[in-house]
Amino acid sequence: MSHKQIYYSDKYDDEEFEYRHVMLPKDIAKLVPKTHLMSESEWRNLGVQQSQGWVHYMIHEPEPHILLFRRPLPKKPKK
């Protein structure tokens, strides 16, 4: 599979999560399941490479070739 064609967005966040999206080329996108969110082993098997802790959290129906990921931000110590 062509890992060079996978595009990784910059990371962005809110108060709770860090987010990123990953755009897959058409040949890989056709392998994305339409019935469920992928486990880490499933998206890694497609060639997506990112650190541990990312969760495929949403399917964007109009653009199924874009995978939406998030992971919890580290808890800030209370002052």
Swiss-Prot record:
Q: Its biological function? A: Binds to the catalytic subunit of the cyclin dependent kinases and is essential for their biological function.
Q: Which GO terms describe its molecular function?
A: cyclin-dependent protein serine/threonine kinase activator activity; histone binding; protein kinase binding; ubiquitin binding
UniProt modified residues of type N-acetylserine: S2
Q: Name one GO biological process term.
A: cell division
Q: Which SMART domains match?
A: CKS
Q: Which organism is it from?
A: Homo sapiens
- Per its record, how is this protein called by name? Cyclin-dependent kinases regulatory subunit 1
List keywords of the entry alphabetically.
Acetylation, Cell cycle, Cell division
Superkingdom field: Eukaryota
UniProt keyword annotation of Acetylation present: yes
**In this record, what's one Pfam family?**
CKS
* Annotated Gene3D superfamilies: Cyclin-dependent kinase, regulatory subunit (3.30.170.10)
What are the record's GO terms for cellular component?
A: cyclin-dependent protein kinase holoenzyme complex; nucleoplasm; SCF ubiquitin ligase complex
